[in-house]
């Protein structure tokens, strides 16, 4: 799928996952989700302090969280801005590595598995998925499990809840 995905990676904290692996996972996930057009997204791995600032600024919650997703369409649509390059701008995913590490420990699996779970959750948000109620949440969690199965991590991340 060369040229299909422009993935921008920013690691404010070292990633236990190689850049090529991140790219491979996102390409598989986008294919699994039926995305056919070229697209662009960014992934930032960061600290609790940084994600807390973002959470406070954009969600008015003064606390760290595990993952934030900023969908480009939500940000650009009010201004009538459209991409004229033919590349679908998905947006940005930000993951707190310290929070992911704590969640991985609590769930009894590796950090890399938790990061994949959180990245898949963020990607679904960029593609318009949301979980305003329990049924929507369960559907989204099931889709995440399918995405992890597509990269052979299905049995290793057994989340039942996602905040």
UniProtKB/Swiss-Prot annotation:
The terms under GO molecular function for this entry are: metalloendopeptidase activity; RNA endonuclease activity; zinc ion binding
Q: How is the cofactor bound?
A: Binds 1 zinc ion.
Question: In the record, which residues are listed under signal peptide?
Answer: none
Report the EC number(s), separated by commas if there are several: 3.1.-.-
The record's annotation in InterPro entries points to:
MetalPrtase_cat_dom_sf_prd (IPR023091), YbeY (IPR002036), YbeY_CS (IPR020549)
Compartments (UniProt record):
Cytoplasm
Which keywords fit this entry according to its UniProt record? Cytoplasm, Endonuclease, Hydrolase, Metal-binding, Nuclease, Ribosome biogenesis, rRNA processing, Zinc
Q: Name one GO cellular component term.
A: cytoplasm
Q: Does the keyword Protein transport apply?
A: no
> Where is Zn(2+) bound in this sequence?
121, 125, 131
Give a GO biological-process term: rRNA processing
Major subcellular location class = cytoplasm
Question: Which PROSITE patterns does this chain map to?
Answer: UPF0054 (PS01306)
What are its cofactors?
Zn(2+)
Keyword Transport on this protein?
no
Q: What family does this chain come from, according to its entry?
A: Belongs to the endoribonuclease YbeY family.
| Protein task | Single strand-specific metallo-endoribonuclease involved in late-stage 70S ribosome quality control and in maturation of the 3' terminus of the 16S rRNA.
Name the chain's protein.
Endoribonuclease YbeY
Biological source species: Synechococcus sp. (strain JA-2-3B'a(2-13))
């Amino acid at each position: 799928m060369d040229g299909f995905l422009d993935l921008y990676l920013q690691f404010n904290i070292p990633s236990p996952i190689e850049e090529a692996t991140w790219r491979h996972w996102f390409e598989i996930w986008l294919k699994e989700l039926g995305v056919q057009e070229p697209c662009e997204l960014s992934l930032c791995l960061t600290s609790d302090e940084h994600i807390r600032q973002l959470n406070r600024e954009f969600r008015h919650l003064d606390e760290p969280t595990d993952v934030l997703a900023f969908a480009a369409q939500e940000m650009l649509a009010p201004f009538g801005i459209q991409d004229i390059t033919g590349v679908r701008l998905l947006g940005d995913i930000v993951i707190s590595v310290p929070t992911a590490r704590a969640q991985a420990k609590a769930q009894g699996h590796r950090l890399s598995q938790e990061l994949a779970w959180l990245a898949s959750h963020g990607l679904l948000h960029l593609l318009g998925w949301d979980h305003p109620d329990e049924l929507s949440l369960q559907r989204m969690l099931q889709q995440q499990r399918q995405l992890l199965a597509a990269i052979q991590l299905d049995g290793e991340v057994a989340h039942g809840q996602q905040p």
